[in-house]
């Protein structure tokens, strides 16, 4: 049997009776249902090792139970719960009653529920039509009540097990959910009927945490859970609260859920069923026992999986020896012609390029051929024809094995409902080709703006050269920018021309190659240390593949910067549990990618800032969170101190040793500033501080063992600073040998710690900022932004370091 834990080293204490659980699913499936009743969920709980599921007895609709049957549940009180395949949230519709354990009281409550529940549920559905179960579509009034009533299977008698405490935070929700992008996801946090409210109101990851079950184990998930308010309450860490559950119990619960999820998972080829949702809400606690008080489970049959794409062929896409282009006009500057010009302008050999065009000998000195298969197999084929012609081109390329990789430029292939059918036809052809012995060609796009590959020596963006971002003139850096949106990449590089990645890759619609595929390739590319990814959505299970590759990239010493667009809350269905709302799609994506080791940006601005820092500081050592800060303006010093806390992480203002402080005082005395400037952190050197003082103070801080990074805020408006783009020899010229620019560049080369600059002051001083950025010293417009960006970057570096120290590899 496979190991269904996420890690080969996982210490799992849980024992799962998979045969018993599969039998429960089989019986339910044969009964025509795709969801378990509550008492069946408790049977699953017993099969995964739960110690204390409550005793239950189903009273089927239409039966006349005896007094003995009604009194079969121990205790002075008993809980009555309505049983229906369409009612999940029973409390909201009057489907839960607690009564004295007496036959007459039970019968009265039971009969009342059989009438009142349909009435209340019907009113709820009429108020929430969008969340109505499909079984009741189009029904209202009496017809709706009757349909609901017909679905009532009876009432479940449940053992009443009062918790030790009913105060806030003493209930726990634990849920498994099958997600389209990340597969099986485990979540846990504050439970009960107000679980969604807690998740909405509390800070991120305070009420609930989530993780992919293939990317974690019980111990790792428990370490995340320990950061929540839920754990604080359960562990008795709040005033007046006593511990009500042991760490081992929680760990065993998480272990069992991970094993359960990974067995009944779409990633398990042997899975007899797939769990779509499994939830216990809540677990209550009595005398150090975890008591499940309600549960749901939905499941489905396994679906056929798609043949993996031959990711190794991405090498031919990024490093082609031969390039073909379809769609080049001989008479005008269309997209194909612009792409041709950009390929040649980047220096790709003209004799290695072919234009696919009948009736034409050459265009711009490049030879034309009548079809894609005329002169053997191409490494890369750029298809710049309208979308309606793409299916025929794809057919020809596949049938004649004409190319190793294909770039689909045109849109109109899946973005709209009208183009959906055409897209599905193309996808089916490509997937079929991947079943061949060599895997067939790989396709990037459609709706792809192109690729700039410095190592491959080409540029296929359809942007005219005179409108192209000027970063093309800069020295390539060991980074890759992968963007689902070409426009996002283009606009970002226009705003940040000092960004200069080796690869700039527009993924488009992910008709074939995915974000996960590209990171899988780039994690092993020797030209890349930093991978920045802008994502709008993942293909089926590609989020999981993406995270696995992120983790492997991090373990290999690389950095991954990630931004996910689209945070709209998912629609809520009456037949879904709380888990889907608590751990929504964006929250799951952010959690999984962050836990894999990437730094996750919350805004586009953060993404660009973090990419700049990763590109320029990757080779620097980051050993801690102790910051040294220098400014020539008092307000900047204050703003830097105010910016060290970024919510999930805090930089510390480093203390200075007596040796360092003495060196600083000596510098101040030499500059006759000892009566004006105090040694502190942040250090305000006032506008009287010259270029030398700024840099020498920064050098002392960088040499100080108690400092891990330095932010140096320049004051270009100061009369003491050489900050203008004037001729050398001018007293304010940044080109002088004693200028702040010259000194900072030399200091950055000497130090192995991060040095980040800030330079306010408007466009007059843009040349100095640009010179620093171009030389690899990151510069921000404001000091507070510099500190906040550095804090997030340091957090990610320390997180990645902890992952590498753990040495855990994802299967």
Where are each of the predicted segments found?
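Catalytic-core regions of core metabolic enzymes
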Residues: 1-811
């Amino acid at each position: 049997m496979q190991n269904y834990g996420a890690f080969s080293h996982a210490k799992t204490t849980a024992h799962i009776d998979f045969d018993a659980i599969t039998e429960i699913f089989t019986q339910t499936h044969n009964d025509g249902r795709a969801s378990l009743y509550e008492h069946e969920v408790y049977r699953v709980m017993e099969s995964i090792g739960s110690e204390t599921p409550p005793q239950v007895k189903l009273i089927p609709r239409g039966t006349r139970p005896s007094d003995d049957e009604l009194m079969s549940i121990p205790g002075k009180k008993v809980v009555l719960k309505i049983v229906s395949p369409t009612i999940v949230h029973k409390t909201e519709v009057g489907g839960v009653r607690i009564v004295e354990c007496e036959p007459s009281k039970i019968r009265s409550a039971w009969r009342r529920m059989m009438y009142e529940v349909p009435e209340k549920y019907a009113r709820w559905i009429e108020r929430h039509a969008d969340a109505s179960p499909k079984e009741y579509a189009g029904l209202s009034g009496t017809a709706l009540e009757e349909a609901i009533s017909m679905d009532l299977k009876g009432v479940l008698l449940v053992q009443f097990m009062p918790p030790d405490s009913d105060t806030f935070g003493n209930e726990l929700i634990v849920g498994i959910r099958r997600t389209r992008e990340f597969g099986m996801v485990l979540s846990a946090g504050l439970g009960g009927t107000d679980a969604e409210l807690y998740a909405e109101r509390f800070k991120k990851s305070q009420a609930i945490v989530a993780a992919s079950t293939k990317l974690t184990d019980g111990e790792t998930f428990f370490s995340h859970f320990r950061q929540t308010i839920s754990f604080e309450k359960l562990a008795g860490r709040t005033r007046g609260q006593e511990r009500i559950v042991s760490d081992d119990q929680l760990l065993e619960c998480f272990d069992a859920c991970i094993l359960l999820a990974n067995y009944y998972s779409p990633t398990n080829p042997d899975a007899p069923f797939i769990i779509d949702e499994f939830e216990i809400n809540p677990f209550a606690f009595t005398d150090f026992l975890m008591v499940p008080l309600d549960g749901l489970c939905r499941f489905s049959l396994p679906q056929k999986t798609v043949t993996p794409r031959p990711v190794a062929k991405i090498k031919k896409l990024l490093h082609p020896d031969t390039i073909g282009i379809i769609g080049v006009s001989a008479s005008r500057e269309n997209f194909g012609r612009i792409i041709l010009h950009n390929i040649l302008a980047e220096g790709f050999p003209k004799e290695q390029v072919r234009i696919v065009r009948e009736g034409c000998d050459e265009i711009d000195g490049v030879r034309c051929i009548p079809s894609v298969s005329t002169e053997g197999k191409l490494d890369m084929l750029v298809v710049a024809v309208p979308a309606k012609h793409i299916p025929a081109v794809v057919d020809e390329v596949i049938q004649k094995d004409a190319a190793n990789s294909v770039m689909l430029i045109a849109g109109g292939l899946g973005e709209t409902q009208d183009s959906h059918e055409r897209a599905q036809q193309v996808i089916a052809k490509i997937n079929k080709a991947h079943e061949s012995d060599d895997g067939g060609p790989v396709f990037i796009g459609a709706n792809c703006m192109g690729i700039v590959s410095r190592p491959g020596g080409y540029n296929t963006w359809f942007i005219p050269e005179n409108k192209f971002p000027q970063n093309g003139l800069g020295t390539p850096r060991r980074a890759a920018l992968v963007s689902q949106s070409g426009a996002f990449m283009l606009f970002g590089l226009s705003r940040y021309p000092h960004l200069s990645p080796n690869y700039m890759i527009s993924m488009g619609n992910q008709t074939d190659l995915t974000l996960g595929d590209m990171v899988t390739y780039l994690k092993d590319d020797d030209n890349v240390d930093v991978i920045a990814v802008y994502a709008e959505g993942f293909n089926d299970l590609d989020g999981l593949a993406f995270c696995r590759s992120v983790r492997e990239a991090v373990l290999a010493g690389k950095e991954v910067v990630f931004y996910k667009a689209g945070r709209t809350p998912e629609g809520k269905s009456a037949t879904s549990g709380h888990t889907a709302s608590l751990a929504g799609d964006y929250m799951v994506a952010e959690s999984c990618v962050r836990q894999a080791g990437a730094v996750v940006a919350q805004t586009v601005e953060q993404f660009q800032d973090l990419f700049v820092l990763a590109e320029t500081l990757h080779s620097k050592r980051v050993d801690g969170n102790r910051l040294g800060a220098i400014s020539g303006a008092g307000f900047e010093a204050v703003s830097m101190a105010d910016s060290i806390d970024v919510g999930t992480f805090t930089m510390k203002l480093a203390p200075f040793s007596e040796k360092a402080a003495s060196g600083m005082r000596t510098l101040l005395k030499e500059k006759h500033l000892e009566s004006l400037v105090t040694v502190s952190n942040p250090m305000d050197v006032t506008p009287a501080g010259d270029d030398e003082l700024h840099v020498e103070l920064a050098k002392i801080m960088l040499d100080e063992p108690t400092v891990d990074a330095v932010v140096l805020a320049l004051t270009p408006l100061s009369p003491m600073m050489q900050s203008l783009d004037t001729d050398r020899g001018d007293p304010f010229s940044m080109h002088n040998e004693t200028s702040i620019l010259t000194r900072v560049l030399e200091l950055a080369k000497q130090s192995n710690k991060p040095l980040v600059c800030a330079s306010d002051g408007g466009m007059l001083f843009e040349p100095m900022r640009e010179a620093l950025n171009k030389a690899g010293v990151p510069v921000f417009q404001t000091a507070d932004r510099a500190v906040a960006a550095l804090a997030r970057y340091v957090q990610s570096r320390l997180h990645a370091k902890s992952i590498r120290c753990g040495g855990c590899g994802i299967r």
